[in-house]
């Protein structure tokens, strides 16, 4: 399956997931980042209401599960690789199971959960680098799409996020199968998380959780890259509305490093500099964590 199709299905699941935590009848969205999504989901519910005979949240849950099943079937039909990548060193696959279809569905759901978890991580990273008093339509939209995580108090969010990444690490290590890992010693164990004493295994899973957390940096740079390319494309097509939306998105991801009020003063290379710095930071942290996981003392 092409990555763009996979991401589109992830986004479809995300839209119905967020709808479980929102009440459009009691909320008003005067925001170009949100109004289109809300109108689309409202149209879907209006079309299916005579068929489903369900309350809106129950219908959203039903459609969420339907998209997950559809994603699983499409990925299986087109021979997609059933993998979850953590950092640049670890690739996990679904475990062999008697009921293969159920196993693939659960792993497909886990893939989407990882997508949502990384989006939550991006939200926290953006909040950390953004001045508290700064608000924007893009920031409001991002907070909407990470519900219910954005409902939590800011001081509690890092701990909840680390706990979720820790739970993900435990599931990947003890339920899924590690297919490949970047190992300094080719003679070592295929799965370094199951070697050594218990305290060493727990420590290495903790580092895997931190490595999963740093994947938020990768997600941040990917989002920034897409917005930069989309902004250039919109400018070439003279689509002023799309240019404004992309510019606000770039400004959101740059946080306090964005140039405000600097338009019209020549080319701004801040997004590209930010992209390369964050990508370098992500690669450096990833290499350090991989070396710690493969430390001979703990294996």
Language-model features: locations:
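Selective transmembrane helix interface/packing segments
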Residues: 1-299
